Amino acid sequence: MNISLKSKNALVGGSSKGLGNAVARQLALSGAKVTLVARSKDLLVDTVNELNKLTECKHEYLICDYNDHEKYSKIISQYLFNNRIDILINNTQGPKSGDVNSLSIKDYQKAFDLLFKNTVYTTMLAIENMKKNSWGRIINMTSVSVKEPLSYLALSNSMRSSVISWAKTLSNDIGHNNVTVNNILTGYFDTERLKELNSDKAKSLT
């Protein structure tokens, strides 16, 4: 399928590597101007330089740590205040792994900020311009765990399910503005995150 996203601006979270990086690349190759968001400057620079050579747009990046909501919110709010975003891809690294018995309330709070609070904060800022332009696409990268919880991923199971419910509520509230909200329930992909989770689980069994 040939999709043209020329004149569209996209913001892609967690896009220095893994699925986020793959999504950012495909959006850029489809004609969108892409702003990549992640912690690793070196990886972001490499990707942006590559995409700038492959496409007609001048792509950008933001260095943000999703684990620090206060700093993240300042950077992302300033960017969205000065830039129009048509396509928002909410994606970030997963929270700490572990079963219910191994987690503290502090762990739950950190996971809430990482997966839910950041998603809501970014989306609500981006929505304003989408509503003004009567066009917007919001996509949340979640997990198959929202359908069937995965073992040793108590935090991810809980917080991603919250994102799903919130996204459905949001779609009901803003759909009349021609702004759509969708969730992608990702499965098992050969990424560094999956290797990390497998290693953590193996250690817990020894």
Place the predicted regions along the sequence by residue:
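Conserved glycine-rich Rossmann-like NAD(P)H-binding loop of the short-chain dehydrogenase/reductase
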Residues: 32-46
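Substrate-binding pocket helix/loop in short-chain dehydrogenase/reductase
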Residues: 99-100, 104-112, 194, 202-205
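Alpha-helical segment proximal to the catalytic Tyr-Lys
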Residues: 128, 172-173
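Active-site helix of classical SDR
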Residues: 123, 159-160, 167
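A glycine/serine/threonine-rich, flexible loop-to-helix segment
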Residues: 176, 188-206
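Conserved glycine-rich cofactor-binding loop
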Residues: 9, 16-17
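Residue(s) in the substrate-gating loop at a strand-loop-helix junction
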Residues: 143
